[in-house]
Amino acid sequence: SLGLVGSEMCIRDTYNSKGELMNNQFIENGQDKIHQHFFTPENVKPTFDGQPEADDNDPQKLVDYLYVDTTPWDKTRHDKEAEITGGSNPVGLKGVIRFLKDRKEFDLKIRLYHGYKSKGNPETGTFDPFYKPSGILIQRGTWDINLNIPVVVFWSREETVGVDEDTNPEGVEEDGLDEKSNRAIHSIMGTFNLTWKEALEEFIIYTYKSGDVEAGAIWL
């Protein structure tokens, strides 16, 4: 399952076609030693109001991923019942992706590697980076999961709009804000096919009324 929080996407659980949690199949009985998720952006292009950049096809400039798997896998550090071990044993059943560029569209290729004997790179003695499984690793294993998810990063979480919680959208004329605010609202309009008023309402709800999901709703 995926959870989007601002410019971050949290990876939590994997389910089978019956809706049954199957994380344990990739962790227990030594399976954590041969499994690792990889996340690779492909087919990158700017959104309707974005601009192409020279490094758009450099995965490290587009996304960042942090493996935050825990031991035990079904406990949380928040409850002080587990330790984060993703750095020394990356699996990717728990992790956070940060989208580093705004106004980009791409396919996020998510793959779960299953090594025949190991998930370590025998040439480097380390684990391959989250965005690029090596050729030798691919030769020595297979994919348990291989899928693409379309991603649109339509604006930056640092962008602001010159309205407050009590602003009445009815009283704000289209393009009646400052230049940066107008651009942000038009990005929302174009992405979700909304009117100026609808986009302004959505921004106010998201910014002021949706609650602080980062204050503890997602626990590792």
What are these regions (language model features)?
Residues G19-M22, G95-I97:
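Extended, compositionally biased non-globular segments
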Residues E123-W219:
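Short beta-strand elements
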Residues L2, I34, E105-D107, N146-N148:
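Extracellular structured ligand-interaction cores
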Residues S7-E8, T70-W143:
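Exposed beta-sheet edge/beta-hairpin loop segments within beta-rich domains
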Residues R12-S17:
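Beta-strand-rich structural segments
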Residues L2-I11:
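Short, small-residue-biased leader/transition segments that mark boundaries at the very start
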Residues M22-P72:
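Extended, polar beta-sheet/loop recognition surfaces of beta-rich domains
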